[in-house]
Amino acid sequence: MTTISLRKSNTRLPPEVNRVLYVRNLPFNITSEEMYDIFGKYGAIRQIRIGCDKATKGTAFVVYEDIYDAKNAVDHLSGFNVANRYLIVLYYQHAKMSKKFDQKKSEDEITKLQEKYGVSTKDK
């Protein structure tokens, strides 16, 4: 089913579908231009961010202008072979990407730093 027929049939998309894709298992030496060549075939791209430090190398975020283009890319590029590596293309999900943190611990750390540097957030 093409992107145009998806739009015309007023197909409802699953809730996890969004314009931002998270791509894993990329070759470490892939360039932005190569990413645009691969992902641009499925629609207009707003932004591509490739991981460059030790922890994020081999990953990227691809942001499409249109949600249907993103769905089409996921459908066609999951498992796509690039330099003998099979891409893992997922929809970005904020809850899964962000680390859970202890709010009380964070507030305690902020309080300690405020005391250390003499900073107050209270109105005088």
Curated annotation (Swiss-Prot):
Keywords: mRNA processing, mRNA splicing, Nucleus, RNA-binding
Signal peptide range: none
Presence of the UniProt keyword Cell inner membrane in the record: no
Annotated compartments: Nucleus
Domain RRM residue range list: 19-94
CDD domains named among the record's database cross-references: RRM_SF3B14
GO terms, molecular function: RNA binding
Pfam family membership, one: RRM_1
Claim: Nucleus is one of the keywords in the record: yes
GO BP annotations, alphabetical order: mRNA processing; RNA splicing
GO CC, alphabetical: nucleus
Segments for region (Interaction with pre-mRNA branch site): 16-29
InterPro entries from the UniProt entry: Nucleotide-bd_a/b_plait_sf (IPR012677), RBD_domain_sf (IPR035979), RNA_proc/Spliceosome_comp (IPR051847), RRM_dom (IPR000504), SF3B6_RRM (IPR034150)
Domain of life assignment: Eukaryota
Disulfide bonds: none
Record's function text: May be necessary for the splicing of pre-mRNA.
Protein name according to UniProt: Splicing factor 3B subunit 6-like protein
